[in-house]
Amino acid sequence: METLSSVGKRIPKRDAVDKVTGRAAYIQDLKVPGMLYGKILRSKYPHARIVRIDTSKAKKLLGVRAVITAEDVPQIRYGFIKDQPVLKSGKVRSYRDELAAVAATDPEIAEEAIHLIEVEYEALPGVFDPMEAMKPDAPLIHEENKSNILKIPWKLVAGDVQEARKTSAFVAEDEFEVTWVTHCCLGTEGMIADFDLRNNLTVHRNTQIPSLAHRDFKDALKVMGFPDAKVRIIKPTIGGGFGSKLDTYGFEYIAILLAFVTRKPVKITRTREEEFRYTSTRQPAMMKIAQGCDKEGKLTFRDISMILDNGAYTSWGATTPSVMMMPISSLYKVPNVRYEAKCVYTNNTWSQAMRGYGNPQATFAIESNMEQLAQASGIDPLEFRLRNANEPGEVTPQRFKVTSCALKECIEEVGKRLDWGSKKKGPKVEGRGIGMASLIHVGGGARVYKSDGCGTIVKVDDFGNVDVFTGATDIGQGADTIIGQLVAEEMGVLPEDVNIIDRDTDVCPWDVGVHASRTTFVAGNSAVMAARKVREKILDLAAGFVDRWKDKQGNKHEMKLDDDPKNLVIKDRMVYSVKEPEKKIALGKILRGAHYEKNGTMIMAEAFYDPDNENLDKEFKGNLSKAYAYGAHGVEVEVDKETGKVKILRYVAAHDVGRAINPMLLEGQIYGAAAMGVGYALTERLILEKGEVMNPNFRDYKLLTAKDVIPVEPVIVESMDEAGPYGAKGIGEPGLVPSAPAIANAIYDALGIRLKKLPMTPERVLKAIKEKK
């Protein structure tokens, strides 16, 4: 294996010191001269006609600079299918609906003004259950649609499921259900909007999609009558995303409108309670599944149908069925597949991208049912998975082209570390059980848009310091650190010589955004390409460079390394001759020569990497990603039969990552994702009653805390993907995908009880124990 100096090293995150010392500036820390503060009035009803809005009292309050409703401003619409106006008129469809907004000299005055706005409503019947919402006589959320079923036909068919079911030796079928959970980023959302005298807009926003937000805000300016105005987005330090910042929201456009009306910068940030109430969630789903296998335990078919709660409007959450198709069609070798999903409008909150993007929901059903099918066939669950595991070179029913794949190795690692065979065959300890589940996720980008690309500009100064302008966004996952290591490796410099600039759309290249675990693969490849061009430029210069100096006696000397740049290397801030390693010249000296010599040149280069993956066609088939990430998680649990509490004794997480660019950050991703997955499985639930969030705080929303940290054992399996930067694949999302089914399977092994609804709280476990008795 090649010897590497930066790649594969356990280098701390670049922003770690700034964060722990309080130097990092988040959106909450930013203040612009003359800034006003915005607040938003939202609906008191989940479904109602708006009869009247009276803002007169709010406008009279000292310190208020503007009050706006839908009647006062252009009607900007947003969302995946643009079904949502920024400020509502006519009627409201959820408690999240924005009716009016205030800009004032301080947040307290703005809050007081909001309470002075009077709204008269005419309540309408609400519908909060997707099954009820599909009935012919259900209240319509959007009357113009004539139905509450979203007109996006999520359907995938490959092979003949009906015939395969008839010929299967064993069939297992069941129903599973998952509910709302939310992102719980430590950094809540916020934005500052500021116009100059030419109506150009500058935005400070903690977003995952600066380039796409730039496009959306540009469209908003067109609606406002300024098609030629410019948009600039500056990102502060971002305290987590997990998909929550993968779209533009109403509050952003409201900040823009208030800034335009007042001609002052306007800042809107969310409180923690507002974050719980008004941030989009993971999409709830009701899932029916059937799978079959032959006598040898080889899968014959998989058949799944789903009903998903779309909420009152359509955000990116409505597209999660496109990712649910991935494990349904391509987790294990399954020749015949059928999948259909319906997204249904209700008066509940609407959903958004969230880490895993539909994959955790689908995998919970698939891997719980795989356990049932293994039991029906009489085959050990681990062996059953090995018999059906994906392999390199495979083309799945959805036409995914599997390149690197170490799923079998991951399953075997879980079995070995949990001592699977002995625990399954030996005497059982009461209340204890082991379980496992596998995963597939995109690991080489995902062509959701027309482009899946990312740009990079690399520039070197006189002294060998490297500036990398990347389109990628660091939202806490360590993208800056990884890109720095890749560039350092490619150029032969030290990681500390590399500076990453990723905060400003005026200077940074275009990128489609932080989603689909794509940053290491796509932005990494882009950075490597640009760095390689710069390295080649430097070596070309070095080949023609003559080093001249005088010794202490005043004698002149000169040296040339080699006429052929292929015989030169950069290492530790020096350029060396490969043939004569004792011959070396300081990198900075060569670079200064390029700038000061006659006919000098700039040492910089750009690259744009767009993987040759495919958009899914009308049948939802195509090679969505350039590479696929695989993994398997194994869990040992202990269940208290008196309380129903599930204690995780061991948690093994084996991941095929291609190559670990930074094992320490990679392990951190696995730790964090597994903790999020365990929360999804056991504790987390956003409780809605008739559309209203009932637990909008960390006291009542049971997020795992430091005292609940599980004993995760990360296992890194390197399959070396030929298309990845130095062999790497994405890892950001996969680590939470199989947690819930692995735990559910372990609980079944411990108690003989199959839990089919998340979260598997002590109350639900205890109820199941009592029902079994």
Residue ranges and their predicted role:
Residues 38, 201-205, 465-470, 648-650:
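Short, aliphatic-rich beta-strand segments
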Residues 241-263, 267-269, 479-487:
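Thiamine diphosphate
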Residues 77-81, 113-116, 205-206, 214-216, ...:
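Short acidic, glycine/serine/threonine-rich loops at helix termini
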Residues 139-222, 388-465, 694-705, 710-716:
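Helix-loop-helix junctions that connect adjacent transmembrane helices in secondary transporters/permeases
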Residues 60, 70-71, 224-230, 259-268, ...:
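C-terminal catalytic domains of large/alpha subunits in multi-subunit enzymes
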Residues 1-152, 171:
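Flexible, low-hydrophobicity surface segments
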Residues 11, 90-92, 181-184, 279-282, ...:
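Short Gly/Pro-enriched turn/cap motifs at secondary-structure boundaries
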Residues 9, 15-18, 147-191, 284-368, ...:
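Glycine-rich loop/linker segments at domain edges
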